[in-house]
A protein has these predicted regions:
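Hydrophobic/basic alpha-helical segments
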Residues: 1-177
Length: 177
């Protein structure tokens, strides 16, 4: 690596062993040596803004995402009385829904109890934008804002990525002929 002018950043280098609980119990790796550096395994690693854990159940990613989202919701709620509905919606899109939509295709197939945590964030965001009471029915608010539920947002993102790939493939084929 040194001959290629590459060096590891010791503070950021980590590795993750992925498997089921039973598989992880059988593995006993303390550290691996890369060049002159010992790299020890971690239970959670961050890559491109997503948190991955040993069992790939995304629980760490979801809990950190919910924590950050509720923090921003709290801050927006403090200044809500000074904002119009449109500005509140813009802030919610900038700070909350953009985070919910980032890498959400990784969440496809997770159990409902995991996705319900993200749905609570989306529901609280809709209530904040519409200035609705805490216990009002959420479906009309989401419909009025034209927001999909979390599970539908994930499926929509996957369909969008797939259709873009097919469109690009067709354009490349048409360019050949």
């Amino acid at each position: 690596m040194i001959s290629d002018n590459l060096m590891l950043n010791n503070d950021k280098t980590e590795f993750l062993i992925i498997g089921t609980r039973q598989q992880l119990a059988k593995v006993n790796i303390n550290c691996i040596r890369v060049g002159s550096t010992d790299v020890c395994p971690v239970t959670v690693a961050r890559n491109l803004g997503s948190w991955f854990d040993e069992q790939l159940n995304m629980s760490t990613h979801i809990s950190k995402l919910c924590g950050v989202a509720f923090y921003h919701l709290h801050n927006i709620k403090r200044i809500r009385k000074y904002l119009s509905r449109e500005s509140t919606e813009m802030l919610v899109h900038a700070f909350i829904t953009s985070r919910l939509d980032y890498c959400n295709s990784l969440l496809y197939g997770l159990p409902n109890y995991q996705l319900n945590k993200l749905q609570r964030v989306l529901n609280a965001s809709a209530r904040l934008v519409c200035n609705a009471p805490t216990f009002c029915h959420i479906s009309p608010l989401l419909r009025g804002l034209h927001w999909f539920p979390v599970k539908a947002r994930i499926e929509f993102k996957i369909l969008l990525i797939t259709s873009k790939q097919f469109t690009d493939l067709l354009l490349n084929i048409c360019a050949i002929y």
